[in-house]
Amino acid sequence: MKLFSLLIIFGIFYQSLFADTATLPKIQNQEFPKEELKKQKIQIASMVTKEIAKTLPQKIDQYTTLISIKNDDATLVYTFDINSGAKSDEAIIKEDHSRMQRAVTQGVCQSSSKFLEAGINTRYIYKSAKSKKRLFVFDITQEACSKLK
């Protein structure tokens, strides 16, 4: 799946959100002060959620649609529908879990490192577009990123 395009979208949302936010200090070169992020992480997660929610649903690629976002304290929770065609839910879970988890974790770790360092974590939930069955849940934290190296 083309998860890279999703990660680009998240980076753009993050940058545009903070560039216009009066409650945060002005940041040169799009750098985010880690201490400010830590102090305001729940507020930031809530603001990110509100901004991204305005654009939903959003087709990510031919298989994947971002259908909702919410924040659970300082965790951004993204929910996606996967349209797998004729492939069964069980086959997707069995065949795609490891590959998807690694790709999603690597992408989020690269695009959101400042947020992860500040304690703003990410959870990706993937559901079947047909059955609505939960296929995958990936929790991405700074610790998960450090395990990739």
Outline where the language-model segments fall.
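N-proximal, solvent-exposed amphipathic alpha-helical segments enriched in charged/polar residues
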Residues: 21-73
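Short, low-complexity, Pro/Ser/Thr/Gly-rich segments in the mature regions of secreted, periplasmic
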Residues: 137-149
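A mature extracytoplasmic/lumenal domain signature
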Residues: 80-84, 126-130, 140-142
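Outer-membrane beta-barrel proteins and related beta-barrel translocases across Gram-negative bacteria
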Residues: 43-44, 83, 123
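Sec/Tat signal peptide C-region and signal peptidase I cleavage site
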Residues: 14-19
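Sec-dependent N-terminal signal peptides
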Residues: 4-13
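Mature extracytoplasmic domains of secretory-pathway proteins
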Residues: 58-114
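A short amphipathic beta-strand at an alpha->beta junction
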Residues: 105-136
